[in-house]
């Protein structure tokens, strides 16, 4: 996602793609530490759900996904549904927190493995899913 006026086109194209029945994968991590599994999420990607609701009248689900390359697995967790009646700032926080909590819980429940972090850091600094030290 671009951080200038192109973001509007990105959101519009995303909504069009969703309306066409496509699934969208969003990787919302930023370079701010959160825990040993994830970096914090940028929140504004949730605005796609608001725009989608305005266009379709349907609430969008965000499906938490955890990639565990060392285990050769992709895990999908319980969907988190956008609430169009809630203030958007509140929904951004709620959805991001629910996604981060769900992904973290999924990762921690798995056998010990190396977590491939969002930031480009040396492999020697990679943590495991059972580490107590945050990524950043």
Predicted regions located by residue number:
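Short, flexible loop segments at the rims of nucleotide/cofactor-binding pockets, characterized by
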Residues: 1-5
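Non-catalytic C-terminal accessory region of glycerolipid acyltransferases
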Residues: 8-136
């Amino acid at each position: 996602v671009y951080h200038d006026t192109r973001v509007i086109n990105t959101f519009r194209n995303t909504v069009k793609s969703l309306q066409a029945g496509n699934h969208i994968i969003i990787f919302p991590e930023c370079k701010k530490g959160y825990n040993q599994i994830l970096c914090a999420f940028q929140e504004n990607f949730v605005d796609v759900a608001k725009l989608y609701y305005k266009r379709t009248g349907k609430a969008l689900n965000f499906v938490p996904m955890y990639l565990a390359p060392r285990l050769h697995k992709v895990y999908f967790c319980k969907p988190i549904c956008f609430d169009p009646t809630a203030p958007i700032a509140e929904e951004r926080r709620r959805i991001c927190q629910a996604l981060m909590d769900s992904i973290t819980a999924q990762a921690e429940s798995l056998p010990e493995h190396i977590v491939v972090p969002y930031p480009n850091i040396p492999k020697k600094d990679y943590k495991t899913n059972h580490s107590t030290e945050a990524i950043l």
